[in-house]
Amino acid sequence: MNNTIKTDVLIAGCGCSGLYMAMNLPADKKILMITKSDCESSDSYLAQGGMCMLKCEEDYDSYFEDTMKAGHYENDKKSVEIMIRSSADVVKDLVDCGARFAREADGSLAYTREGAHSSNRIIFHEDITGKEITSHLLEKVRTLPNVTIMEYTRLLDIISRDNRCLGAVIRTGNGEIIKVEASAVVLATGGIGGLYRHSTNFRHLTGDAIAIAIKHGVELKDINYVQIHPTTFYSDKEEDRSFLISESVRGEGAKLYDKNGKRFVNELLPRDLLTEEIRKQMAKDNTDFVWEDLRTIPEEELKTHFPNIVQYCIDKGYDPSKECIPVVPAQHYFMGGIKVDHESRTTMDNLYAIGETACNGVHGRNRLASNSLLESLVFAKRAALDITKNAVVKPTQDEITYFDTFDAEKYADESKIDGEYAELVNKKIEEADKAYEESQKKNYA
């Protein structure tokens, strides 16, 4: 006999998208949030550079064009418009939650710039913007009496009947397997970096929700669109995850050099193009890394804007205020995911997807720097509003019987699930890669 929890909304994931969604749901909705690790171990916490926003109406067209160009014009234009137009309201919400962003002397927001941006439009807090945002969202959500958070609790599967999601199966930190009956299930489990040997992501982010979607026939989109970040700290020692050297340092003037100390590239190229150039240079030089020079940034600014990057490098034996540091590309972000509409609805009834798990097409084939936090927040709020305005459809007797008799104990072997889910995701990405390559051959035949 399986234990059962009943809730209005189940949110699988405690990153910024899951937390912001919980904040924007009505107080009379009972919400259960689960996270595979602790609440602080989401990739939202790791975001360094900042978050884009529409700073003035005059910047709209160039911001839109920068996003489209970086995405190779494969972006969903409506998604891009929604994201940009919603940015100011999101920033206001974050400030109201206590999030602090860098300010000019007159108190106005300070803006920085990153690769492929035509102007400064990125707000930031030192080099830990994601932590600043997500920690304040978490602090707020923990005060909400209608929200329960279960840490070290994994989403094992959803329970569906005739393309309608009825709930989910979860495993708690003490190994208990529980069925969750929910009027709406939200997949916000992050990306797929844990499937890669070298990634900036936490290791436990292995695309569980993507595998579950594949298993249940929920549509995916752009599953092979995986972003490699051009600059992570190079170490010849294996580490849990690659440490990001934020794109903001290049936005502030950092340069890239080959083994002979010669600059070889425009540092503000879009991420995919810069990664390609770095890999070419590494092959040409027969090296495992290239050099990044942060000494072009005034020392005081370097230490105040990027204190954590500076300290990390010092801990690894490099003082970036006095010498170049070794950098190498690593897997960073998943542009593809579970296909959703502009309200974050999947192709299964009562099932939503938000954050890096979802794909609404906003990023196209390559994400513009510092659009990830914004996109996650904007479309999480839209999902919350969609759930709020739609009346709950009570399950049929057939669905109730199916849920009640569903045997969750078949998920007892977690290592088996790990293998099956990783295989599902990797196979689907490989298939999409092959299909893309074939389409390119036809286009250029």
Role assignments for model-derived ranges:
Residues 1-7, 24, 39-40, 46-53, ...:
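Glycine- and aromatic-enriched mobile tails/lids
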Residues 212, 218-318, 386:
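An anion/pyrophosphate-binding glycine-rich loop and adjacent beta-alpha core
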Residues 9-33:
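N-terminal Rossmann-like FAD-binding beta1-loop-alpha1 element of flavoenzymes
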Residues 77-88, 121-139, 150, 200-207, ...:
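Short beta-strand to alpha-helix junction loop
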Residues 37-68, 72, 230, 240-241:
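Conserved N-terminal glycine-rich FAD pyrophosphate-binding loop of Rossmann-like flavoproteins
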Residues 184-237, 243, 373, 377:
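Glycine-rich loop(s) and the adjacent beta-strand/alpha-helix scaffold that form part
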Residues 95-176, 188, 232-236, 256:
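Conserved redox-cofactor binding core of oxidoreductases
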Residues 150-151, 156-165, 170-171, 305-359, ...:
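A glycine-rich dinucleotide-binding beta-alpha-beta segment and adjacent secondary-structure elements
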